[in-house]
Amino acid sequence: MRLHLLKSKIHNAIVTSGDLEYEGSITIDSQLLELADMLPNEKVLCVNNNNGERFETYIIKGKAGSREIQLNGAAARCALPGDEIIIMTFAEIEAEKAKDFKPMILIVDHQNNPKRRHLVGEEDTPLPH
């Protein structure tokens, strides 16, 4: 049996912009992607902390250091610039391996600077801005 588990999360990211005319997706600073163990084209579930809305899309790699979190296409209607969102990826893992699996959590500040990261159940690693 395979279980669908949280793989990684960017916690409390701030939406920086939106582009309704784009084909779809979420553009994320490539440094944040690397720190969060996320990949371009990976499916994400996003939760808007301001209004509770949940939506799915896929990742586009943004410019390193830009701190951009841009919603594109229809997703741009789900959160406005300034809204706080949680971005999550998931993986299918064999039940036996799932017992020991630990997702990566990246915490960012309100300018989307990485503050700290950790595997669930382990100590935080503080990160320089």
From Swiss-Prot:
The active site is at residues 25, 58. It comes from the Bacteria. Its cofactor is pyruvate. Is synthesized initially as an inactive proenzyme, which is activated by self-cleavage at a specific serine bond to produce a beta-subunit with a hydroxyl group at its C-terminus and an alpha-subunit with a pyruvoyl group at its N-terminus. InterPro entries: Asp_de-COase-like_dom_sf (IPR009010), Asp_decarbox (IPR003190). The keyword Nucleus does not apply. This is Aspartate 1-decarboxylase. It comes from Prosthecochloris aestuarii (strain DSM 271 / SK 413).
